[in-house]
Structures are given as structure tokens and as C-alpha cells.
Amino acid sequence: MAISSDAEFYVVIGKAVSKAIDEVIERIFVEMQQEIEREVYSAGSSGDYDRTNMLTEAWKHEARGLFGDIEFQPSMLPANPSAFQHDSPYGWDVRGIIFDILEGGYRAYNAKTGKFIAPRPWWDNFLAKVDSKIDKWVRAALRRQGLVVI
């Protein structure tokens, strides 16, 4: 395809880059879900509560033009105060800070046993993984859109 103006160049390149960004955002989202599964849900359980396994789904992710966004949506987590799932009968809704609790560790969930829930640094691990692979993912996505990337 011959491009004869700056406007055509930006339209053609913009579409290709936008599609590539869609692909990369989706890839990052899947990697994040896998990291949560590995670092949070596969890290063992106190047995004192039933997991909802919703931390992997409580996210809005979208690509908009030439950038993308992945945002935690605490309201997507179910709150079951009687079962102490993300809330309590005493009004301690922790959905908005659940990842801070996981990152830093927490004692309250194991108040019966006195055992501390160890920190789970899933976020740092996830960022390190993305940092190590993002260039490769972007180049591959751009190539799939027909762009030659050096």
C-alpha cells in the first residue's frame, strides 16, 4: 500500500499500533491473572475461610487508541460479611485494600491461630516479568500487524 500523505501515514500506522496495543494489553492481563493465581491462590490457605477466587477477574482492562489501561475494580469482588469474605459483620470492607494486605501480610485472618499470613509480593514479581518481556511482546504484536520493527 502506498502512503501519499502524513495523514494517511498516521491512519495506517495508528490502526496497526492500536491493534498491537490491544494485543499487548490482553497479554499483560493474562500474565497478571496467572501471577495472581500462582502467588496468591497457590500459596496455601489458612483453611479458616472459603476463597472466592475472584481476584483474577476484578479488573477492567481495555486499550484505547494508542494506550491501554488495566485497573483494579474492588466493587467486582463479592462481599460476604458473615463469611468474612472481603468484609465482616463489623463493617471492615477490605476490598479496596486487599492487594495491600496480600503484599504486606496480615494477622487478622488467623486471629484464631495467631499465625501471620506471610507477604505475597505478587505485584513486584508481575512487574519484573512484564519489564523483562514487554519489548518482545510489543515487537511481536507490531510485526503481526505488518510493521517491520528493528
Where are these regions (language model features)?
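Short, Lys/Arg-rich flexible segments
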Residues: 1-77, 94-150
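Short, surface-exposed beta-strand/loop "edge" segments at domain boundaries and coil↔beta transitions
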Residues: 76-94
